Amino acid sequence: MLTFGTAGLRGPVAPGPDGMNVTTVTRATAGLADWLIARGHAGAPVVVGRDARNGSEEFAAATREVLAARGFDVIALPDPAPTPVTAFATRVHGAAAGVMITASHNPPRDNGYKVYLGDPPCPGAQLVGPADREIEAAIAATEPAEIPRRPVAPDRRARAARADYLARICARFEDAVARPLRIALTPLHGVGGDLAVEALARCGFSDVHVVGEQFAPDPDFPTVAFPNPEEPGATDLLLALADDVDADLAVALDPDADRCAVGIRDGDRWRMLTGDETGALLGTWVLDAVAESAVPHGDRPVVASSIVSGTLLHAAALRRGADARRTLTGFKWLVRAGEPLVYAYEEALGHCVDPAAVRDKDGISAAVAAAFLASSWIGRGGLAAALGALHAENGVHVTAPRSLRLDDPSEIAAIMAGLRTAPPAALAGIPVTAADYAERTDGLRTDGVELTGRRPDGVALRVFARPSGTEPKLKYYGQLSAPVADGSVSTVHHELSQLLDDVLAELPAGSRGEEIRR
């Protein structure tokens, strides 16, 4: 049976309690409505949006009609739209909640039901506990036969949501300078293509070339094995286009456009930046813009990254006098890291560049920010040079993940137990110590183990190990960092990359671990 958690619902579109279907969505919405009414939100605005996946229109209709029958003021977005538009509308209209029908970058068979709440101190953010457990209990108490529905049409607010979101993006970047830039872009068969192209054009970037085979929304995602820009092969068409048109920047959105991946020309080849590289570049760009702004900001600006993300942004932020904070994984925690929050990211390609308007990851505004950043480096070596400058300033940081699929959950538990009780004494010749995050007494307590160490020459190692919360996987997140002394940035980067491969290869993998590369 599908259970309601902080991510709402997500699963295959299928009949019965184990699948996403109209009955499941109807019950979930009735439970959410009852919970909102019990908290004093009867008759309040609630935003409902959807992507273009199989079942999304039917599920959105069920959601808005159940809410309308319960007396809520439903803001029903009229067309398939990116998830950030729903998050934005929830916040800007002071809604009690927002519901987005999407499964983001999951396989074509899946769909989902994501919930934002309007409660302070973080209105428009994804819900956190105990709200998920309370809503789950309300859903369990609901019988499908008792749930009425009432048709509801999009009103002026709903019809204006797209234009309002675009206007906000223009306002967010009104002080940035756009220089001529050629961009290659793909929405990976999702709903972000038209909106991204229009947002870029309105901010001064009209030279945009799109991957035609992937531009129109298609719930079957026919050109990719997985519609996730992290996956091998997903951005092959994008990078080929970027090379063909001699682009300055490549951008890939995931299907609901809440994630943004950036590709750059690095020497004689194109490559996708890692989420950590993009996060460090965008985060420092935001901080530098804040420092140059004439608007007083009072307290030190806050940037946030998750415990599995790299530490390059952390180092750069501290050098700039900012407050750099770490949170548990997930934007429900990142956007609650502290105030005044100016930027948040996690290594899985999620970026929040406008937390005043969207308290979640937002691929559209991240793409616009990347365009402004890239245009500022035209004639100076591009984003490859920008990244090199960041490494020269803060030390070279190299990150890489390793994921293992282990169908036996007991094997994952055994590996985690071994890391806690008998961790390796060294990895690739670097002595390490282990810290068990399950024993922490602060807000970072979780099922994870961190291995850290340092060589006499200043090379620092960090590996975070944790089981996946949604799949039978064990995940390692590795990082090596080192100051740039005698060697060049590229030389140090190459040496650390090779060493990190050795580190990850020495980590426990279990007897039947299937390597998952991304």
Could you describe each region identified by the protein language model?
Residues M1-R70, R156-L181, V191, F464, ...:
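An N-terminal, well-structured beta->alpha segment
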